[in-house]
Swiss-Prot record:
Coiled coil: none
GO cellular component, one term: plasma membrane
Catalytic activity: K(+)(in) + H(+)(in) = K(+)(out) + H(+)(out)
Protein name in the entry: Low affinity potassium transport system protein Kup
Pfam family, one: K_trans_C
Keywords assigned: Cell inner membrane, Cell membrane, Ion transport, Membrane, Potassium, Potassium transport, Symport, Transmembrane, Transmembrane helix, Transport
Membrane topology (UniProt): Multi-pass membrane protein
Family, as annotated: Belongs to the HAK/KUP transporter (TC 2.A.72) family.
InterPro entries reported in the protein's UniProt record: K+_transporter, K_trans_C, K_trans_N, Kup
Alphabetized HAMAP family for the sequence: Kup (MF_01522)
Role: Responsible for the low-affinity transport of potassium into the cell. Likely operates as a K(+):H(+) symporter.
Length: 622
């Protein structure tokens, strides 16, 4: 067992390097340049270079190494991480009011991720392409078109899956990080005094010397840790130890060496501020480095796209987004999915961003507000989990929370002031997603409440039907029921209009549990309610896909035999109308109706054969 673990650990660690660290690993392309480019009033002078390097180093240590890898990754749901997972964990042992607050915070954090995911591919690929400004200045007008071409190809291949090319991600990213380290060492050797910036006093002196202006500089320094949420979100794919091992052995040393190498170059040649990353390389290596940087940024973009697919699936399964088509691109790996609607909406948004902002420096102002906002929420949710779930001492938890927020809040506020210069973009995108998620959840709850208002008792109705049965026809009928104790509307309408009932009636409820996976032993519960009525409850985790055929197989094991092609499936199809509401709630109702019209039908969700499906229309006022 241990030898197998030892053999697999290097492979899993290498895979983590290829997926988890793509975003944070491409930050050296633009971070130091943005810190010292002049927009904050800092010249390329020794004290500012030393100050920024010290800030970057200690952010990597305190935020990534300490906060996320040491503390936040302790909070897992059956091994899974991510902001929505943290939200669900935080709400388990709290009051209803507190749970509502935590849910809103979690949804805001998830919405911030949607805002960030539009910027990451754009700024990463454009930064790589901007190597042309150094390698071939005459071609700088092609940076935007080439960036769009590269990302177009990336979004096109999503539907085919990335399983085959994904095997190349880890080796390419390992080469990338080793290259970062080698380039950094090359710069440090030329000017080793730059290593003095490891001393945190340079960061302290930076704040003392520049006073209020240094606060705004945090808006640029945070670029060094964008992508930090991926460490936690991808925990379920690779495990805690491989992610930590990859960080401390490869990623952190490479990043620190490269940042300090760029700093050494700037101390020696302030003119290199134009693009210190590419100017760190010898002339003969510029084109190969640009190709490698492009590959690394494409991989970083792929990791972000995969992340938004996973987050969307989780939100759909937890009821915060409408059902949509989810394609599994791998028979072996459940995490490899493709969501066409999200893919193409994201592509259109990324292209618009590239065309509108034209240069990665313009996009840098938009980057950061979503990241730091999520960091603040993560700190609060984590400390809530520590107190409520793990029973930590409240005072120690408060001390930890204050310590985390002392770092998170100033960085968030420093990015808030950039709203007019681009920070509005992720905020606007995040707000749209927040409105969609809260609208779908609340209006869906309102709809279900209206559907269940008839108040008829299921047990009483079954007893009545058994005592005075209507005309019974041969076969099995399955009625989908959202609640276990409520009569399905399709059953009521079938009796009302057709006045018949099948010989066997199965009331099927599909549940999504607050866990990524459900044990097979708990998958299906079968309960016989009467000689001809059965209740079947199928439980799935949010990372799993409901499968009616699998449910039938497990029903057979429990003594209830159902054949897919010999069963009639009854569903209700709601036609929505908006009742009397204030104007703002009418707008929300119209948004819900639009989302409902475009949502994936339940029959398609469960892959029910069309010739076995009977839909009964009902009109519902919401």
């Amino acid at each position: 067992m241990s030898s197998e673990h030892k053999r697999s650990l290097p492979a899993v660690t290498l895979a983590a390097i290829g997926v988890v660290y793509g975003d944070i690993g491409t930050s050296p392309l633009y971070t130091l340049r943005e810190c010292l480019s002049g927009q904050f009033g800092f010249g390329v002078e020794p004290h500012s270079v030393f100050g920024f390097l010290s800030l970057i180093f200690w952010l990597l240590v305190l935020v990534v190494s300490l906060k996320y890898l040491t503390y936040v990754m302790r909070a897992d749901n059956a091994g899974e991480g991510g902001i929505l997972t943290l939200m669900s964990l935080a709400g388990r042992n709290t009051s209803d009011r507190m749970t509502s607050v935590l849910v809103i915070m979690g949804l805001i954090g998830g919405s911030f991720f949607y805002g960030e995911v539009v910027i990451t591919p754009a700024i990463s690929v454009m930064s790589a392409m901007e190597g042309l400004e150094i390698a071939a200045p005459a071609m700088d007008s092609y940076i935007v078109p080439l960036s769009i071409v590269v990302l177009t190809l990336l979004f096109i291949i999503q539907k085919h899956g990335t399983g085959s090319v994904g095997k190349l991600f880890a080796p390419v990213m390992l080469i990338w990080f080793l290259t970062l380290g080698v380039l950094g060492v090359r710069g440090i050797i030329a000017n080793p005094e730059v290593l003095q910036a490891l001393n945190p006093m340079y960061a302290v002196r930076f704040f003392i010397e520049y006073k209020a202006v240094s606060f705004f500089a945090l808006g640029a320094v945070v670029l060094a840790i964008t992508g930090v949420e991926a460490l936690y979100a991808d925990m379920g794919h690779f495990g805690k130890f491989p992610i930590r091992l990859a960080w401390f052995t490869v990623v952190l040393p490479s990043l620190v060496l490269n940042y300090f190498g760029q700093g050494a170059l700037l101390l020696k040649n302030p003119e290199a501020i134009k693009n210190p990353f590419f100017l760190l390389a010898p002339d003969w290596a510029l084109i190969p480095l640009m190709v490698l940087a492009t590959l690394a940024t494409v991989i970083a973009s792929q990791a972000v796209i995969s992340g938004v697919f996973s987050l969307t699936r989780q939100a759909v399964r937890l009821g915060y987004l409408p059902p949509m088509r989810i394609v599994h691109t791998s028979d072996m790996e459940s995490g490899q999915i493709y969501i066409p609607a999200i893919n193409w909406m994201l592509y259109i948004a990324v292209v618009i961003v590239i065309v509108s902002f034209e240069h990665s420096s313009n996009l840098a102002a938009a980057y950061g507000i979503a990241v730091t906002g999520t960091m603040v929420i993560t700190s609060i949710l984590f400390c809530t989990v520590a107190v409520k779930n793990w029973l930590w001492n409240r005072y120690l938890a408060w001390v930890l929370l204050v310590g985390l927020l002392i770092i998170d809040v100033p960085m968030f506020l420093a990015n808030v002031v950039k709203i007019l210069s681009g920070g509005w973009l992720p905020l606007a995108l995040g707000m749209v997603m927040f409105i969609i998620m809260t609208t779908w959840k609340s209006e869906r709850f309102r709809l279900l409440r209206r559907l269940h208002e008839h108040g008829n008792s299921l047990d009483a109705m079954i007893a009545s039907l058994e005592k005075s049965p209507p005309t019974r026809v041969p076969g099995t009928a399955v009625y989908f029921s959202r609640a276990t104790r409520v009569i399905p509307f399709a059953l009521l309408h079938n009796l009302k209009h057709n006045k018949i009932l099948h010989e066997r009636v199965v009331l099927l409820t599909m549940r999504t549990e607050d866990a990524p996976y459900v044990l097979n032993a708990r998958r299906v519960t079968v309960e016989q309610l009467s000689p001809t009525f059965w209740r079947v409850i199928a439980n799935y985790g949010w990372r799993e896909t409901p499968d009616v055929e699998e449910v039938f197989q497990r029903c057979w094991q429990e003594g209830l035999t159902c054949q897919m092609m010999e069963t009639s499936f009854f569903m209700s199809n709601e036609s929505l109308i908006i009742g009397e509401r204030p104007w703002y709630l009418r707008l929300r109702g119209k948004l819900f109706m639009m989302l409902s019209r475009n949502a994936l039908r339940a029959a398609d969700q469960f892959e029910i054969p069309p010739n076995r499906l009977i839909e009964l229309g009902i009109q519902v006022e919401i």
